[in-house]
Amino acid sequence: MLSTFSKRLRGGYQGEPSLFDRISPDDLIFAFFPCVRFENQIMLWFRGQSASQKKWSLEEKCEFDMNLLKEVSLMYDLVNKMFIICIRKGLKLVMENPYSEEHFLRRYWCYLPAVIDKDRRDSGDYFKKPTQYWFLNCEPQNNLIFEPISYNAIECKDAIKTMTKEHYVKTGADNNKTARSMIHPQYADRFIRQYILDEEIWKNKS
């Protein structure tokens, strides 16, 4: 999947025919960009301080760092090419990724997120999951939504390590890893109406 995504981005970036040719400036791209090489844990791996690296030799850590940097560089190329394509074509793009001060794009990118949600439970999602959203060729609406929010939070200290079946079945997922990525419909609905749609549009349809 990643190789296909990379190939399509590379083609569009080089001006070759790509899936971006089928997207209109009136459309909106919502990108859930792969975060595994940007999240804050990546800095621990680079420093050789991850719990999994306790018994590694210095040589092993150095070898690992060289390969890890290549992987981070690949993802960094992809996210920049995606944005450049959208800039050139005037396409609207919203991209989400986890939020933390150690996040790679927070420290090493020229474009800042427009919206930061530090606790998604307050808008009806399952987990706290601090998230940042970049808006390109469009601005967040910042509509006010005066509606009660049902509290759907699944209480567990670490959504990956301590989540049991009792927790993850509440999201409709088959395992804890999938559950970590699930979005409660209420959170998605509120996000779209608060930041994406013009207020008059969703009010007239409600």
Regions found by a protein language model. Give the residues of each.
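Conserved active-site and SAM-binding loop architecture
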Residues: 1-206
